[in-house]
Swiss-Prot record:
Gene3D superfamilies: FAD/NAD(P)-binding domain, protoporphyrinogen ix oxidase, domain 3, Protoporphyrinogen oxidase, mitochondrial, domain 2. GO terms for molecular function: oxygen-dependent protoporphyrinogen oxidase activity. Belongs to the protoporphyrinogen/coproporphyrinogen oxidase family. Protoporphyrinogen oxidase subfamily. This is Protoporphyrinogen oxidase 1, chloroplastic.
Length: 562
């Protein structure tokens, strides 16, 4: 198996939607949301922990002070009903709405998106100050067709920026940053693994390894069995730290890296499954690619000229008054006629909304609390997903602070670096932001985004932001930065107490149990979405959004007026 397949991105993807709960106000108002757009008024902008100028203040400007009250309906009948309410205005919720508005535009689905915060985008947090542009949540995405379609449909085609696919990626091993092979011809020559380790990996990928066990394997068990100890310790373990901030001895191979896991199931070995997949694609070619989409040149990652926040901002602007911010869901009930009644705390008091279907894209622990009145079994399953803390630490150094041995043609080049937990550093990984995308730092400066914490280091919650910045700086001076360099400029330290859902062994069992409990309890039309369902990468959230939209459309097809 190529290391390229498991090391294709250095981006660490954080949860894409979140929702805070707060106490309800007084003054109950029951309304019918009309399908026509209403005017919206401005809100307030998000601020950063250290330097607090946001490039996306527009994303915060969605307060709904004046709610239309045409068709006020105080009971269960006689008034109109929404087709769908999407709970959570992070990237998953917004992209479900966008999919309903574009891919299924012919159906004229009447929906709203509700978000408890005063801005959309969830944990996507782009900041800008003094010539710097940095991310404090997700950093980038892989430019899959689903992501590119969402960007183009949002009017952002000309704002896309893609990293150089030839830029190297590095892993720290034995005190040295070592490049990860980016193409098959690199495999014999890279020094991250020994010659015997490469032979072991090749033989295992061909099928000369122990047979798979009957039980669900962890990532560590699967990789050690199939590809050997070196691939696990020097490639996959740091990759798990960088993508999931997780412990590979607990992560489920099937759930966390299903596309690799299924190869062995399909073809008897990783290579066998790969060959079978290639043949299946030849026998069943995809439909013609959308000619509107740009074509990336090789494996790379992408963003937008002014950061990831451009996407949720653009989607929200296009959806207009269908997006309701500062709407905190306080209760959900099922009526006798099959509709759902949702109660919200809003700036205008309590609002009740009636709908045929609901998609919950909030984190599982929030969904658990909200759904407990409907199903204890579903709520209990959803409460068991684990979210460890992660901090995003953005530092800037003068270019001359970079160690000479880490420069390529006199510049810091590459996507970034990942760190195995065995190498004695706290930092999980480092993104070379100013090398990856243009316009991220002033001339003569570098911008470096670092992640620290995760499932193996929850103690970051006991540290101050200054202590976290010092810990990252200390690690970098052992690897990338000259020990005697001046102190960095700390642009931002953002701590996410519950960051990335862990796809642990038994993940699908919990998810299936929650879904089954809702269905068996008579709660059809109530769907679960978000990153704990689709996958943690931003691209998987968008792909999952299209899947959720298809579920909603299929459910609504039972109504004669659809």
């Amino acid at each position: 198996m190529s290391a390229m397949a498991l090391s294709s991105t250095m981006a660490l993807s954080l949860p894409q939607s979140s929702m805070s709960l707060s106490h309800c106000r007084h003054n109950r108002i029951t309304i019918l949301i009309p399908s026509s757009s209403l005017r919206r008024r401005g809100g307030s902008s998000i601020r950063c922990s250290t330097i607090s100028t946001s490039n996306s203040a527009a994303a915060a400007n969605y307060q709904n002070k004046n709610i239309g009250t045409n068709g006020v309906d105080g009971g269960g009948g006689g008034g109109g009903v929404l087709d769908c309410v999407i709970v959570g205005g992070g990237i998953s919720g917004l992209c479900i709405a966008q999919a309903l508005s574009t891919k299924y535009s012919n159906l004229s689905t009447n929906f709203i998106v509700t978000e408890a915060k005063d801005r959309v985008g969830g944990n996507i947090t782009t900041m800008e100050a003094d010539g710097y542009l940095w991310e404090e949540g997700p950093n980038s995405f892989q430019p899959s067709d689903a992501v590119l379609t969402m960007a183009v449909d949002s009017g952002l085609k000309e704002e896309l920026v893609l990293g150089d696919p030839n830029s190297p990626r590095f892993v720290l091993w034995n005190g040295k940053l070592r490049p990860v092979p980016s193409k098959l011809t690199d495999l014999p020559f890279f020094d991250l693994m020994s010659f015997p380790g490469k032979i072991r990996a090749g033989l295992g990928a061909l099928g000369l390894r122990p047979s798979p066990p009957a039980h669900e394997e962890s990532v560590e068990q699967f990789v050690r069995r199939n590809l050997g100890d070196e691939v696990f310790e020097r490639l996959i373990e740091p990759f798990c730290s960088g993508v999931y901030a997780g412990d590979p001895s607990k992560l489920s191979m099937k759930a966390a890296f299903g596309r690799v896991w299924v190869l062995e199931q399909k073809g008897g070995s990783i290579i066998g499954g790969t060959l079978k997949t290639i043949q299946e694609r030849k026998d069943n070619p995809k439909p013609p690619r959308d000619p509107r989409l740009p074509k990336p040149k090789g494996q790379t990652v992408g963003s937008f000229r002014k950061g990831l926040s451009m996407l949720p901002t653009a989607i929200s602007e296009r959806l207009g008054n269908k997006v309701k911010v500062s709407w905190t869901l306080s209760g959900i009930a099922k009526s006798s006629n099959g509709e759902y009644n949702l109660t919200y705390e809003t700036p205008d008091g309590l609002v009740s909304v009636r709908t045929k279907s609901v998609v919950m894209t909030v984190p599982s622990y929030v969904a658990s609390s909200l759904l407990r009145p409907l199903s204890d079994v579903a709520a209990e399953s959803l409460s068991k997903f684990h979210y460890p803390p992660v901090a995003a630490v953005s530092l800037s150094y003068p270019k001359e602070a970079i160690r000479s041995e880490c420069l390529i043609d006199g510049e810091l080049k590459g996507f970034g670096q990942l760190h195995s937990r065995s190498q004695g550093v706290e930092t999980l990984g480092t993104i070379y932001s100013s090398s990856l995308f243009p316009g991220r730092a002033p001339p003569g400066r570098t911008l470096i985004l670092n992640y620290i914490g995760g499932d193996t280091n929850p103690g970051i919650l006991d540290k101050t932001k200054d202590e976290l910045a010092e810990a990252v700086d200390r690690d970098l001076r052992r690897i990338l930065i000259n020990p005697n360099a001046k102190a960095p400029r700390v642009l931002g330290v953002r701590v996410w107490p519950q960051a990335i859902p862990q796809f642990l062994i038994g993940h699908f069992d919990l998810l299936d149990a929650a879904k089954a409990a809702l269905t068996d309890g008579g709660h059809k039309g109530l769907f679960l979405g978000g990153n704990y369902v689709s996958g943690v990468a931003l691209g998987r959230c968008i792909e999952g959004a299209y899947e959720s939209a298809a579920e909603v459309v299929d459910f609504l097809s039972q109504y004669s007026d659809k």
